[in-house]
A protein has these predicted regions:
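Hydrophobic/aromatic-enriched cytosolic interaction surfaces used to assemble or bind macromolecules
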Residues: 1-203
Length: 203
């Protein structure tokens, strides 16, 4: 499968996209700084052109790091593009080093055996949806109607990946499990999980 990480300079000059190869630099970024686009593609698709078009269309005035993977699911190919915000602490790394790569929790595969279909996580002020261990959707639930965000998130994945809500394994942080939330998940595969201690007070 295709897996690449690219860096774009401040002017977003597409001609200066550069593949990152060096494994020595580890960067951890905040969840809110990741933007995900998922596109259905075919084997003849020019991936680089798709990436360039996405950057031009959605992030013209934004300086991101870009990580993308091709995922095969239900006999279809999907291009998953992660636009990763780069704050001031890391910008100097982009200019000081010719090549480096990224390592951070949101893009790492978890235990692949727990991702037979789709996994939905609600914890630490965000919703994350994984397909076969790949993060394909990330949304903040801060200052939001949680049930509305849950429904909206699942509908988009059902449509894109042709997966039913009954195929999901739901992992919900215990602080979110109020009565109305429990009622919504009634009859579905629901697991209670723990979040980060310092975020409990914000929920």
């Amino acid at each position: 499968m295709l897996i690449k990480t690219l860096v774009i300079n401040d002017t977003n000059d597409i001609s200066k996209l550069k593949e990152l190869k060096d494994k020595r630099v580890k960067i951890i970024l905040l969840n809110e700084k990741i933007f995900i686009e998922t596109l259905r593609v075919n084997k003849k698709c020019n991936i680089e052109e798709k990436i360039e078009q996405l950057i031009k269309d959605r992030f013209f005035n934004y300086t991101p790091l870009v990580h993308y993977e091709v995922l095969k699911y239900n006999k279809s190919l999907f291009l998953i593009v992660y636009f990763i915000g780069c704050d001031e602490r890391f910008k100097s790394l982009l200019y000081e080093r010719k090549d480096f790569s990224l390592s951070f929790p949101e893009l790492k595969n978890k235990n692949i055996f727990s991702f037979k279909k789709a996994t939905f996580e609600l914890k630490n002020l965000k919703i994350s949806i994984y397909i076969k261990g790949k993060l394909v959707l990330l949304k903040s639930v801060k200052d939001s109607n949680i049930i509305e965000v849950i429904e909206e998130s699942i509908k988009s994945i059902e449509k894109d990946f042709r997966v039913s809500v009954k195929d999901f394994t739901f992992k919900i942080q215990k602080e979110y499990l109020k009565e109305e939330i429990k009622e919504w998940f009634k009859g579905l595969k629901l697991n209670e999980i723990r979040g980060e201690e310092n975020l409990y007070q914000k929920i």
